[in-house]
């Protein structure tokens, strides 16, 4: 863990602690935890019933993997799927009651013309023998994973009442080479690590990616000009804009919920303070003015205030200040080190990197019932950079493991953890993107 403040120390060192990797490789998922209390669900293989070439994507496998990694569900192993219905009329509910499954998903893939496919699927409550969901989706071959994630989202929401977040993306930073030959890349991938896309490459460090609320742009820090600078980049076109390159530190950008403003940490006056930039006029408003180090701003969901990390009390803690400025209030009191806040969509939960001695873990403060309660989400010793999924069901974070950087996603109740790892190399600085919209 970089101390006293993770982001500031990274800036002053001008170096990310990353080792060699192959940038072309995507992240792969390894589920390293599970929960016996997860809801049993059978996701039956969905065969291709067309006359052409079958899609390469195994739809049911993607749906099942999504549900598994949510921590809310436990899919029936393939070896125990004794019957393979493809439509509701073929389901023998007593079979699945005997196998103690609460739900069953069946479906099939057909041709839709012009190289596209049509997926029809149904969700059933096994105990009641009733259909809960029946939908059809059409997509070309290269979008079948997207369709699969959307199916998982619909199933998740129908059962839990919470919008699914499988059809989302994550951003992260990788690096290749060693010493002076280090090369950095800002990447975007699906939430399960597939379909990696390089957003920008640089011979200098890249830090702090942050998504615009519409998911179309990333703000990030680059050192390509010799000093830290903040850029906005369009993910689809690659067009980018330099928005902050003041003397000293330009860091930790964070889009406002309406996408019109950017919170950032600047030391243009000599000491790191929190500012807000109007992205239309580029006008700056200084929110804090303190001799302590103020950094790592992140917006409250309503856009009315900003959380940030400050050591003004002697040790790093999370504070909150109105988006228009004013006095700041301390938010965290549990432990001696709380930094890098991520706030859930409803503002009731705050995930932080929490330190004790030389150990840093991801912890969550939950204010759903009024008084704050704390839980530890990660078991590592150098865990940092928490980032909530848009539905707050999971938290993505960075860890050091075996001398290299990996990402983990943990369910917000800490029941299930999954590792997102490169076969050879490091990955850091994760940021979970917003919901996507079908066009």
Swiss-Prot record:
GO terms for biological process: cell division; protein import. It comes from the Bacteria. Gene3D superfamilies: TolB, C-terminal domain, TolB, N-terminal domain. The keyword Calcium does not apply. SUPFAM superfamilies: TolB, N-terminal domain, Tricorn protease N-terminal domain. It is found in: Periplasm. InterPro entries: 6-blade_b-propeller_TolB-like, PD40, Tol-Pal_TolB, TolB_N. Residues 1-22 form the signal peptide. It holds the Pfam family TolB_N. GO terms for cellular component: periplasmic space. Keywords: Cell cycle, Cell division, Periplasm, Signal. NCBIfam families: propeller_TolB. Part of the Tol-Pal system, which plays a role in outer membrane invagination during cell division and is important for maintaining outer membrane integrity. Belongs to the TolB family. The Tol-Pal system is composed of five core proteins: the inner membrane proteins TolA, TolQ and TolR, the periplasmic protein TolB and the outer membrane protein Pal. They form a network linking the inner and outer membranes and the peptidoglycan layer. This is Tol-Pal system protein TolB.
């Amino acid at each position: 863990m970089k101390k006293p403040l993770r982001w500031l120390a990274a800036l002053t060192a001008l170096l990310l602690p990353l080792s060699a990797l192959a940038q072309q490789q995507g992240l792969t998922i390894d589920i390293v935890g599970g929960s016996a209390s997860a809801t049993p669900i059978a996701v039956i293989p969905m065969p291709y019933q067309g006359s052409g070439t079958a899609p390469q994507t195994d739809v049911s496998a993607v749906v099942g993997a999504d549900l598994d990694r949510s921590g809310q569900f436990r899919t029936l192993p393939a070896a125990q799927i004794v019957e393979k219905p493809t439509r509701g009329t073929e389901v023998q509910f007593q079979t699945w009651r005997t196998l103690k499954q609460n739900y069953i998903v069946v479906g099939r893939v057909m041709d839709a013309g012009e190289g596209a496919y049509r997926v029809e699927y149904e969700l059933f409550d096994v105990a009641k023998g009733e259909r809960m969901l029946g939908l059809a989706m059409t997509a070309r071959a290269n979008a079948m994973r997207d369709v699969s994630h959307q199916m998982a989202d619909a199933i998740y929401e129908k059962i839990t009442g919470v919008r699914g977040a499988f059809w989302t993306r994550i951003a992260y930073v990788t690096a290749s080479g060693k010493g002076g030959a280090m090369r950095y890349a800002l990447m975007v991938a699906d939430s399960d690590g597939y379909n990696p896309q390089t957003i920008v490459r640089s011979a200098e460090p890249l830090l702090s990616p942050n998504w615009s609320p519409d998911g179309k742009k990333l703000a990030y820090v680059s050192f390509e000009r010799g000093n830290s600078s903040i850029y906005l980049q369009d993910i689809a076109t690659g067009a980018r804009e330099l928005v902050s390159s003041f003397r000293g530190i330009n860091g930790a950008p964070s889009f406002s919920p309406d996408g019109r403003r950017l919170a950032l940490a600047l030391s243009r006056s000599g000491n790191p303070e929190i500012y807000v930039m109007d992205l239309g006029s580029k006008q700056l408003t200084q929110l804090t003015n303190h001799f302590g180090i103020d950094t790592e701003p992140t917006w409250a969901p309503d856009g009315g205030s900003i959380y940030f990390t400050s050591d003004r009390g002697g040790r790093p803690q999370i504070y909150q200040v109105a988006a228009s400025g004013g006095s700041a209030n301390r938010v965290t009191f549990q432990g001696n080190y709380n930094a890098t806040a991520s706030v859930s969509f409803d503002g009731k939960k705050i995930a932080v990197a929490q330190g004790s001695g030389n150990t840093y873990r991801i912890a969550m403060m939950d204010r759903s019932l009024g008084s704050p309660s704390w839980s530890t989400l990660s078991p590592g010793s150098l865990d940092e950079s928490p980032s909530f999924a848009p539905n707050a069901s999971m938290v993505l974070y960075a860890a050091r493991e075996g001398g290299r950087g990996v990402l983990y996603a943990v369910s917000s109740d800490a029941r299930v953890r999954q590792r997102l790892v490169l076969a050879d190399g490091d990955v850091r600085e994760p940021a979970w993107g917003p919901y996507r919209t079908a066009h």
